[in-house]
Amino acid sequence: MAGIKSLKGDRNLRGDIQAGLVLGIQSVPDGLATGVLAGLNPMNGLYAYIVGSAAGAAFTSSTMMVVQATGAMAMVISDVPAVHGGNDQARALATLSLLTGVVMLIAGFLKLGSLLRFVSNAVLVGFMSAVGVNIILGQIANLTGYAAPGDNRVIRTINTILSPTSIHWQSLIIGLATIALIVLLEHTPIGSFGLVVAVIVTSALVPILGWTDVATLHDLGFQVTAAIQWTLPSIAHVPILLVPAASLAFIALVQGAGISAMYAKSDGQRPDVSRDFIGQGVANVATALTAGMPVGGSASASALNAAAGAKTRRAPMIAAAVMILVVIVFGSAVDYLAMPALAGLLILVGYRTIRPADIQSVWKAGNVQKAVLVVTFALTMFVPLQYAVLVGVGVSVVLHVVQQSNQVTVRRRLKNEAGDTIEVDPPKEVPPGEVVVLQPYGSLFFASAPVFEEALPAITATSTGSVVIIRLRGRVELGTTFVDVLARYAAELERAGSRLFIVSVASGVMRQLKTGGVLDAVGADAIFLGDERVGAALANAREAAEAWIAQQPPR
């Protein structure tokens, strides 16, 4: 038995080492490129990859999750002025990473993962599609060697197209060659290493061809080094970085939740989403102190980790060690990676972020979903991403409220000649001398209260001597707006000489009926508490209603 366990352990270790090597080597150019994408020192991206991978693996629940800086998060950071330029740039970035981690930790400890379901798929697809386009447009300057003027990426791209004579064609050739080589090598046995090989090969072509005007990391003053610059956050930056930190945390948590749902743990159980939130939060706190940019669960890195044979959480830790080793051994050579080559890599990342199948699926879902998709996409293209994310969340919440409120229906329950219970449309008006049993369906909260009230039978001068029974089985709580509707309807029925009975009432609903004045309006004898017997409370209410109607004088 011990031998079997040892063999399994050896297999796991081999798988983790293999995955760690693949992930670590691939992550060096990827991390540098992500730093470039964020408009930061490329080492901020690489440090985030190193520290995020190790810390995330130690504290997340998901075995396969790899915590690194992502393209979407980098685009948000690129729109945060406080972390670009100035003497406090490093401390501002550290503060942003720390705040992002704190938000994630709060979300994890409060188990707020369930709130992500309120974000509609249309918003996510619109946002991620725009992020992909922004990634592409944001690298046009590095790809072409021409930084065109303009207030945003779209205008700068248009100005670049309109100024072909300003394009540095040698840079463009290197960038396009990188894209073509990555795509070509991915379909060979090299596989995931194709990204690394392509960037190295095209960067090496620059000095070989004598194209000294093609920009490299070294030309821009960046130095690839394993010597981490320890940085402390700045309290002064907290107020201006709260909004971008919340946006970054939201993006990371949405992407991380998708990874959690995708990969089961070694025991077959689904990972704990809240624990993954906490792990990502810890990783951000660690990167904040080590000059790294904010990090979150990376879908592409996690997929590569799993495909490369990872078995346990050791794989990302090994990858972090590999990254450090690569920087120590090859740091001086990495300094000469060509900026157009990194731009080509990022443009390919942006292109693959856009998923036409998802866009088509949302587009077919209806006009409301189309509108949400278009609005979110437009906002993300022309508004700083830190605000576009939060507006997208707001759009999702409003959309959810509108959809839920419009789904409220009211049905009348009757017995047919065979004695079966059937449901039909409620009458337009409350008929005289009858028991009318109404069953509401849908979410009964403040936004749906007007829809519910409009669906109730109208009360006229002839609506006398009747009892309307509203069945609330399964409702554990009612909003105050809905309680007000019940109170008004009860008062109208009383003025017409009729009554309102409420049945299958839970204890929580009973407290709200007392507080909202409904109990006083209908009387204690008109409230029928529910229990485990389905239909018992309704039968008692119907019997009481028929007895009350029988006692009424003829009108």
Sequence positions of predicted segments:
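Intrinsically disordered or compositionally simple regulatory linkers and C-terminal tails
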Residues: M1, L538-R555
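Transmembrane helical cores of multi-pass ion-transport proteins
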Residues: M1-K415, G517
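Conserved short loop/turn motifs at secondary-structure junctions
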Residues: G39, L472-R475, G530-D531
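Active-site-adjacent beta-strand anchor residues
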Residues: V67, G126, I502-V503, D531
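The feature marks cytosolic C-terminal regulatory regions of anion transporters and related permeases
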Residues: V224, R352-G516, E546-I549, P553
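Short acidic-hydrophobic, aromatic-tinged amphipathic segments that line or gate anion-handling sites
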Residues: V522-A537
